[in-house]
Amino acid sequence: MTGRLWRGGMVFGGLMLLWGLASRSGIPHFLLPSPLAVAEALWVNRAYLGWHTLITLSEILGGLALGVTLGVTLALGMILSPRLQRWLMPLVLTSQAIPVFALAPLLVLWLGFGMSAKVAMAVLVIFFPVTSAFFDGLRRGNQEYLDLARSMNASFGAQLRHVRLMAALPALGSGLRMAAAVAPIGAIIGEWVGSAEGLGYVMLNANARLQTDICFAALFILVLLTLLLWLAVDTLLHRLIDWSPE
């Protein structure tokens, strides 16, 4: 953990150095504000940015909870019923073939400008990696353990609970890590399409007023939220699935 934090700090410091040098190379401030200008915008607008951060965070966490629940449920349903799999898999794939930006206006139209549309957008982005990873893990259970369970006359439910589920947990962990990384995308897209709250709204509003420092400040907060969410999920998975090399 310490080594990972050290490497992350080195990368962050390098990016800050490159950013600072680029901002002093003659690029206009309204195109690329300096790191100090962004830090000042973060401090001066801390109450304003803090409120909108809470809105976006609640949308992300709501979408993550519902998206993971939906993904796990779909994967279990498809592994339990091959017929259901034949019907659901094309629908799951179709949901990812449609661009997220194309669905955002429709969700805002159907669900309104409140939080529901943003959470629904986050669910659409999140559920697929969870479904795909968990279903693949369930399907690739250790054949030797499955044969041993069958030789002991274990029922399908017992095989699923004691063999397939345990073997699929690392794959589910990979899906959860991916979901944590992409969770903010759906919420931000929903805020861009139609919202008066959240970091996506802050970025659009600041961009329209050429307040690039505030736009960068909101983007910095969003990146920080994503990294912290991913680290929280990764740390939790390492504690819960400590027997897995992954």
What are these regions (language model features)?
Residues T2-G26:
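N-terminal signal-anchor transmembrane alpha helix
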Residues R24-V68:
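Periplasmic/extracellular loop-to-transmembrane helix junction in inner-membrane transport proteins
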Residues G62-V92:
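Transmembrane-helix boundary motif in ABC transporter permease subunits
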Residues L93-P129, D136-G137:
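Generic hydrophobic transmembrane alpha-helix motif, especially the helices
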